[in-house]
């Protein structure tokens, strides 16, 4: 069935997330091994082997040049506008979707991309450069330095010879020196080793740097602080033991490169204090690849050591380009709209070249870290910064003897937090572990998005050589001997590095250790470090930009160490990257909210991880797929026992986490139900209490009415027959043998006597009430107050007071109380017509 045909019944569509990446990996491997390559490109007397289909698909220029060519081994010589330095990264981009950029080759790459009409690259990467690197709002460094650098971890005794070795340049060294534009904005120190050009050419190529005063250092560093609520607790926990390493904190801005002249005068260039932060841009976030400047990191101390832009030797013939010092000064005076990269280069052409003395190079290894100022707010960062012309005070050393150029202090845009939060959900598990290239310390690099789940990763054993103190520079930015100068200044700690919306690949060129990384995109090669050897910030020297549409989150990759090739095409002689799978560490974490706890942020023991596990599918499928689909996926791939064990462990932990979440939810539901029941019972209790009070009030009113009626009945008694009749209907009122009613000991009028009087009234008015035998058992109740009223009424009428005395024995002491039950019983049995009585009274 054709793909375009519409089936009669619904069809199941499987979309692979790694197919595109696998195709590119296979083509790149074929190109490096010269398999099925059908075209040879000659650029500046260098040969590049490639496939026509790939070139034609990426470039309109090659489409027009190669379509219709039937020759088997076609040789195409590119015009002089295309340089090897600019074409090399573009060719690698065509096969890997990753563009390696540095300040040395940005200009040539842009020129070559325009000439070759690689519009996809321009729309993605260069739009990013325009909005991020050259935005006058953010105050990022725009000056170029043609002095490229070597790898920072080569032996010092061999660095001098490698500086002069101009004939062994390969594309490996080319890619090693091509750091991405993030080095212009990242707050981490960026290492620049001695260039591979003669000293005289260095003096013309290097840009003179401003001399920064130390009196504004503290204020600038204080302005660089950002406080983000998400990492508040993490900051407090991680800044406890980092102050002793502050003497090695340096910046990742090339604007603070400075030369130490005899006059120490201010040179053209953007001072560190003038660097401002870029407000977040909310439009075209997906089309224009915007890079988050680690905006939600705690402070400047936590920024040192995240990413290092490691560079190797440049081309033998350096291109003498003008510095952008004038542009920097102009940018420092005004806040203009983002300028284009091409306009920047046109401006820089008019600037005079300034020589840099080869006898000395100022290092900033003793730059203190920014103090953790809790009082500063993000609004403080939007103020204008004064030029930073301080001297970092490191001893002068010869340029030949120095393998590293260090940079100024870190600065970060406070407004970028919103941008990071918007892109955070795209990559919740972008936690990166890269192998350590630094002999002194082996640390781990973590990149956390705005909703990244650090608690997952901290729940796992923390790798050895944890985060160094805030003061630790990147290895290249330290003017240390290779024997281990920094070892005494690196307290272990962990810290977050925000995930960026731009896929960035950090490629270490460090020789000794195997790289162990993990990616956040399921469309690229996946690898997951489970051992503790992974990663110091020192091991992340190179930044690669990937404009692959399937790469949504920041992707920090540490590819295999690339060795120089033997041919011109050997510049990309890498080990073929294998298809790897993303791993979500800490899947047994109790929560996916990504929130920090102080226990998590302080859990920094040095522990080892297991071996790296490479999977042919993204790790998300392990936890997301249903049971049947998961088993089918396992059967489709040939997996080793180690991989199976890892897969089942991840799935088991995921199930445990889900079960724990459900259990917590059930408990919360039970608690809520109990709370509802308690509220209902409380309301019912209040209702019953109010009803009881109402009943008491009604009962009191009824007793008052009964008392009045009993008094009237006693007042109406005229003869013994009436008393007998009253006694027959109301046995509680017995005649008393007392001589006078006054001899009866009156009791205070109470509810019980009122009830008794009421019974008398009922007995006279209603002839059906109570038989003598129906009286409740117990001693007869002799009313005191009521009988007193009755006898007193009779005495007033002239009745003989001895009438009652002959009726029975003397009144014995009686109980003066009647229970409420008796009252209710009598009330139920006796009925009265109260309305006439009320009218009568």
Curated annotation (Swiss-Prot):
Renumbered to this chain, the signal peptide range is none
**Which ranges carry the bZIP domain?**
646-709
PTM-bearing positions, type Phosphoserine: 315, 521
The covalently linked position for Glycyl lysine isopeptide (Lys-Gly) (interchain with G-Cter in SUMO2), per the record, is: 382, 421
Q: Which PANTHER family match?
A: AGAP004733-PA, TRANSCRIPTION REGULATOR PROTEIN BACH2
Annotated stretches, region: Leucine-zipper: 671-678
Q: Which domain of life is it from?
A: Eukaryota
Which of UniProt's keywords are assigned here?
Activator, Cytoplasm, Disease variant, Disulfide bond, DNA-binding, Isopeptide bond, Nucleus, Phosphoprotein, Repressor, Transcription, Transcription regulation, Ubl conjugation
Composition bias type Polar residues, residue spans: 584-598
* GO BP field: import into nucleus; negative regulation of transcription by RNA polymerase II; primary adaptive immune response involving T cells and B cells; regulation of transcription by RNA polymerase II
Report TM segments: none
Record disease entry:
Immunodeficiency 60 and autoimmunity: An autosomal dominant primary immunologic disorder characterized by intestinal inflammation, recurrent sino-pulmonary infections, impaired lymphocyte maturation, and variably decreased immunoglobulin production.
Pfam families assigned to the protein according to its UniProt record, in alphabetical order: BTB, bZIP_Maf
Recorded protein name is Transcription regulator protein BACH2
Q: What is the role of the protein in this entry? A: Transcriptional regulator that acts as a repressor or activator. Binds to Maf recognition elements (MARE). Plays an important role in coordinating transcription activation and repression by MAFK. Induces apoptosis in response to oxidative stress through repression of the antiapoptotic factor HMOX1. Positively regulates the nuclear import of actin. Is a key regulator of adaptive immunity, crucial for the maintenance of regulatory T-cell function and B-cell maturation.
What GO CC annotations are associated with the protein? Answer: chromatin; cytosol; nucleoplasm; nucleus; RNA polymerase II transcription regulator complex
Post-translational modification comment from the UniProt entry: Phosphorylation at Ser-521 downstream of the PI-3K pathway promotes nuclear export.
Q: In which tissues is it expressed?
A: B-cell specific.
Gene3D superfamilies in UniProt? Potassium Channel Kv1.1, Chain A (3.30.710.10), Transcription factor, Skn-1-like, DNA-binding domain (1.10.880.10)
| Subunit-structure text | Homodimer; disulfide-linked. Heterodimer of BACH2 and Maf-related transcription factors.
Q: Where is this motif: Nuclear export signal?
A: 821-841
| Subcellular location as annotated | Cytoplasm; Nucleus
Ranges for region Disordered:
153-173, 204-226, 246-329, 583-610, 777-816
**UniProt keyword Transcription present:** yes
């Amino acid at each position: 069935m054709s793909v375009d045909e519409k089936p009669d019944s619904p069809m199941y569509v499987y979309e692979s997330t790694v197919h595109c990446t696998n195709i590119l990996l296979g083509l790149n491997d074929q190109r490096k091994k010269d398999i099925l390559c059908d075209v040879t490109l000659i650029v500046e007397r260098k040969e590049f082997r490639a496939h026509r289909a790939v070139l034609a698909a990426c470039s309109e220029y090659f489409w027009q040049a190669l379509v219709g060519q039937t020759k088997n081994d076609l040789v195409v010589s590119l015009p002089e506008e295309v340089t090897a330095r600019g074409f090399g990264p573009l060719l690698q981009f065509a096969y890997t979707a990753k563009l390696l950029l540095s300040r040395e080759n940005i200009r040539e790459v842009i020129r070559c991309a325009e000439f070759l009409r690689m519009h996809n690259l321009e729309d993605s990467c260069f739009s990013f450069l325009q909005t991020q690197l050259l935005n006058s709002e953010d105050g990022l460094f725009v000056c170029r330095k043609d002095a490229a650098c070597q790898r920072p971890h080569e032996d010092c005794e061999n660095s001098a010879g490698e500086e002069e070795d101009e004939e062994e340049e390969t594309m490996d060294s080319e890619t090693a020196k091509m750091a991405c534009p993030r080095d212009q904005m990242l707050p981490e120190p960026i290492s620049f080793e001695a260039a591979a050009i003669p000293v005289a050419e260095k003096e013309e190529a290097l840009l003179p740097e401003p001399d920064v005063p130390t009196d504004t250092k503290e204020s600038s560093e204080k302005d660089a602080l950002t406080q983000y609520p998400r990492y508040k607790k993490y900051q407090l926990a991680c800044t406890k033991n980092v102050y002793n390493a502050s003497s090695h904190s340096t910046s990742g801005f090339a604007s603070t490169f400075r030369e130490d002249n005899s006059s120490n005068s201010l040179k053209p260039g953007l001072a560190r204090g003038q660097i401002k932060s870029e407000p977040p841009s909310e439009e075209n976030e997906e089309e224009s690849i915007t890079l988050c400047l680690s905006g939600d990191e705690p402070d400047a101390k936590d920024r040192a050591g995240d990413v290092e832009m490691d560079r190797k030797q440049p081309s033998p013939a350096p291109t003498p380009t003008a510095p952008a010092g004038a542009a920097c000064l102009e940018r420092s005076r005004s806040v203009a709209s983002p300028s284009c990269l091409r306009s920047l280069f046109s401006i820089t052409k008019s600037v005079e070249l300034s020589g840099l003395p080869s006898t000395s190079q100022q290092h900033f290894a003793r730059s203190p870290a920014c103090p953790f100022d809790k009082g500063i707010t993000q609004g403080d960062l939007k103020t204008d910064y004064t030029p930073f012309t301080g001297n970092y005070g490191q001893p002068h050393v010869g340029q030949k003897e120095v393998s590293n150029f260090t940079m100024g202090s870190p600065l970060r845009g406070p407004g970028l937090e919103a941008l990071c939060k918007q892109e955070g959900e795209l990559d919740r598990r972008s936690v990166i572990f890269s192998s350590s290239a630094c002999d002194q310390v082996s640390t781990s690099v973590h990149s956390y998005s705005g909703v990244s789940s650090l608690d997952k990763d901290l729940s796992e054993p923390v790798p050895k050589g944890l985060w160094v103190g805030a003061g630790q520079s990147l290895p290249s930015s330290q003017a240390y001997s290779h024997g281990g100068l920094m070892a005494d200044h690196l307290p272990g700690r962990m810290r977050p590095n925000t995930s960026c919306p731009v896929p960035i690949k950090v490629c270490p060129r460090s020789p000794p250790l195997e790289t162990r990384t993990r990616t956040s995109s399921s469309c690229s090669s996946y690898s997951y470090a489970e051992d503790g050897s992974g990663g110091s910030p020192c091991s992340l020297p190179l930044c690669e930009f990937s404009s692959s549409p399937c790469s949504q989150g920041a992707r920090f990759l540490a590819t295999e160490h690339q060795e120089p090739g033997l041919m011109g095409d050997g510049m990309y002689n890498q080990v073929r990257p294998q298809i790897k799978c993303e791993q979500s560490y800490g899947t047994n974490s109790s929560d996916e909210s990504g929130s920090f706890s102080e226990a998590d942020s302080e859990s920094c023991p040095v522990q080892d991880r297991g071996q790296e596990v490479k999977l042919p599918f993204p790790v998300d499928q392990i936890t997301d797929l249903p049971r049947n689909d998961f088993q089918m996926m396992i059967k489709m791939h040939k997996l080793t026992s180690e991989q199976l064990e890892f897969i089942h462990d991840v799935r088991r932990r995921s199930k445990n986490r889900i079960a724990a979440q459900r259990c917590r939810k059930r408990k919360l539901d039970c608690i809520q139900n109990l709370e509802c029941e308690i509220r209902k019972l409380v309301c019912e209790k209040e209702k019953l209490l109010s009803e009881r009070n109402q009943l008491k009030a009604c009962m009191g009113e009824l007793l008052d009415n009964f008392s009045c009626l009993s008094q009237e009945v006693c007042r109406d008694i005229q003869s013994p027959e009436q008393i007998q009749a009253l006694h027959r209907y109301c046995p509680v009122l017995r005649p008393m043998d007392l001589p006078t009613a006054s001899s009866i000991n009156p009791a205070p009028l109470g509810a019980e006597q009122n009830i008794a009087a009421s019974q008398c009234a009922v007995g006279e008015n209603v002839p059906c009430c109570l038989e003598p035998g129906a009286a409740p058992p117990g001693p007869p109740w002799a009313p005191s107050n009521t009988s007193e009223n009755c006898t007193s009424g009779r005495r007033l009428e002239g009745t003989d007071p001895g009438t009652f005395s002959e009726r029975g024995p003397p009144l014995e002491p009686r109980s003066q109380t009647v229970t409420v039950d008796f009252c209710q019983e009598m009330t139920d049995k006796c009925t009265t017509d109260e309305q006439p009585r009320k009218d009568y009274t």
